[in-house]
């Protein structure tokens, strides 16, 4: 870079000097031609020439330095005038060239000086920064950075606006329960669907569980069979349970569950279609094998035949029936959330939120009606069969299609699909009913309908 700068400086100086010399010489020649007033044609021995002299008489122009000789291509006056014009043009052109060279050199020098000055300033600034880094920063001069935007703003931007402080930490908000679109209000569904029914049944086929026997007599006590199954009192009140547990039907308070000493392996399951329950045939006539759901739904007296319950080795999630779209925990959370909404004035709600609350309220009412209907039917059948005292020796094995074995339903809503329409027929045949009485609430209702 320095070599190029030096070369430019040298060329600029040479160009300016040459143009200046040409300007000076051109001006001198033009001045000399202008000083010669006239030119005469003189015949010399070699030929004719135009002889120009300062004097009016050519004889007096003996000095060659003061005389101008021109070849007569044209008349002498025309040649003299043309030479004069050429010299003046050359002088003006040299002057213009000298000016351009001076301006170009000056601009280049200014640019070089400005660049060097900026470099000097930068070096000074860097030195000052180094000195600043060496000093300890003042805490008062610190400016905190702007916090980044919330990562969850886009997730809640499409969901209905609600005051999240009014909802407890154990309450599931509405968008996570109902996956639908109500008047342009977009809500979300749970990301993890329940496992398929066939996968649960196929996994249960590969396991063998221990046995439990429901004995007769003794005081009223209930031992929980599994974490996935809970009891429901006869009055129809459903206790609060964790989100992982599923609700079952009622168990009488006079039932006692005791572990049996002898254990045996259970036969493999027989898989049927989705619309038909999966039945586990029992090898003993007086002790049919029941699942966790069927055992908790059984309403029997202490003096009936013993019921053997199977307790598996798998986790609690796969022992109970597959979960429905809205499980009991979400159901209770929704009731609590709707109750909190109803505590507020309807004037403060938007029309969309008000209509959403009304829709959920109607759904909850329908579910309560179905649950109350099932509990009422079970209580009614229990009152009918209470006076009956069946003997364990009279129990016999039912056909495979009518045997009340392990019942796995598609959802909790299957309870209200059975109605006690055959109650008079059950009253007309009390002895046969007590001999063939099934061991689950759903089996009782189904047998009554048939």
UniProtKB/Swiss-Prot annotation:
The modification Phosphoserine is found at residue 275. Its main location: membrane. Residues 273-284 have a biased composition (Basic and acidic residues). Keywords: Cell membrane, Endosome, Isopeptide bond, Membrane, Phosphoprotein, Signal, Transmembrane, Transmembrane helix, Ubl conjugation. A motif (PPxY) lies at residues 148-151, 194-197. It is found in: Early endosome membrane; Late endosome membrane; Recycling endosome membrane; Cell membrane. The keyword Metal-binding does not apply. Changing residue 197 to A: Decreased interaction with ITCH and no effect on interaction with EPN1. It is a single-pass type I membrane protein. Residues 235-284 are annotated as: Disordered. It comes from Homo sapiens (Human). Residues 246-256 have a biased composition (Polar residues). Prominently expressed in muscle. The chain crosses the membrane at residues 86-106. One of its GO terms (molecular function) is ubiquitin ligase activator activity. This is Endosomal transmembrane epsin interactor 1. Residues 107-450 are annotated as: Mediates interaction with EPN1. Interacts with ITCH; enhances the ubiquitination of CXCR4 by ITCH and the subsequent endocytosis and desensitization of the receptor. Interacts with EPN1. Residues 107-450 are cytoplasmic. It comes from the Eukaryota. Functions as an activator of the E3 ubiquitin protein ligase ITCH in the ubiquitination of the CXCL12-activated CXCR4 receptor. Thereby, triggers CXCR4 endocytosis and desensitization, negatively regulating the CXCL12/CXCR4 signaling pathway. One of its GO terms (cellular component) is early endosome membrane. Monoubiquitinated at Lys-274, Lys-329 and Lys-365 by ITCH. Belongs to the ENTREP family. Residues 1-29 form the signal peptide.
């Amino acid at each position: 870079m320095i070599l190029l700068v030096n070369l430019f400086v040298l060329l600029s100086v040479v160009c300016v000097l040459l143009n200046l010399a040409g300007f000076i010489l051109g001006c001198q020649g033009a001045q000399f031609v202008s000083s010669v007033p006239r030119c005469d044609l003189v015949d010399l021995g070699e030929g004719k020439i135009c002889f120009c002299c300062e004097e009016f008489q050519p004889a007096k122009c003996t000095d060659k330095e003061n005389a101008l000789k021109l070849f007569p291509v044209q008349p002498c006056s025309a040649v003299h005038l043309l030479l004069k014009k050429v010299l003046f043009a050359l002088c003006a052109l040299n002057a213009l060239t000298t000016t351009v060279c001076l301006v170009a050199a000056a601009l280049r020098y200014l640019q070089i000086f400005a660049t060097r000055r900026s470099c000097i300033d930068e070096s000074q600034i860097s030195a000052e920064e180094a000195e600043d880094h060496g000093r300890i920063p003042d805490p008062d001069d610190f400016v905190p950075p702007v916090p980044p935007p919330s990562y969850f703003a886009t997730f809640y931007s499409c969901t209905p606006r609600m005051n999240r402080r009014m909802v407890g930490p154990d309450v599931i908000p509405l968008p996570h329960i109902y996956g639908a679109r109500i008047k342009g209000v977009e809500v979300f569904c749970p990301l993890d669907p329940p496992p398929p029914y066939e996968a649960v049944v196929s996994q249960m086929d590969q396991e063998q569980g221990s046995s439990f026997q429901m004995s007769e007599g003794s005081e009223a006590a209930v031992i929980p069979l599994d974490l996935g199954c809970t009891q429901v009192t006869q009055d129809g009140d459903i206790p609060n349970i964790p989100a992982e547990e599923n609700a079952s039907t009622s168990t009488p308070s006079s039932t006692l569950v005791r572990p049996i000493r002898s254990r045996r392996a259970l036969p493999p399951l027989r898989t049927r279609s989705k619309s038909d329950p999966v039945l586990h045939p029992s090898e003993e006539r007086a002790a049919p094998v029941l699942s966790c759901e069927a055992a908790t739904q059984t309403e029997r007296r202490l003096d009936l035949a013993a019921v053997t319950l199977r307790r598996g080795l798998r986790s609690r999630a796969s022992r109970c029936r597959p979960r429905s779209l809205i499980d009991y925990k979400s159901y209770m959370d929704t009731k609590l959330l709707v109750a909190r909404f109803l505590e507020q004035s309807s004037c403060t709600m938007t029309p969309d939120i008000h209509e959403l609350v009304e829709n959920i309220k109607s759904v909850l009412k329908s579910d309560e009606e179905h649950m109350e209907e099932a509990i009422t039917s079970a209580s009614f059948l229990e009152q009918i069969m209470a006076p009956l005292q069946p003997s364990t020796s009279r129990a016999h094995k039912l056909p495979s299609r009518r045997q009340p074995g392990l019942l796995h339903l598609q959802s909790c809503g299957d309870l209200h699909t059975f109605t006690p329409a055959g109650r008079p027929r059950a009253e007309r045949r009390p002895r046969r009913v007590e001999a063939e009485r099934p061991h689950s609430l759903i089996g009782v209702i189904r047998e009554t309908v048939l």
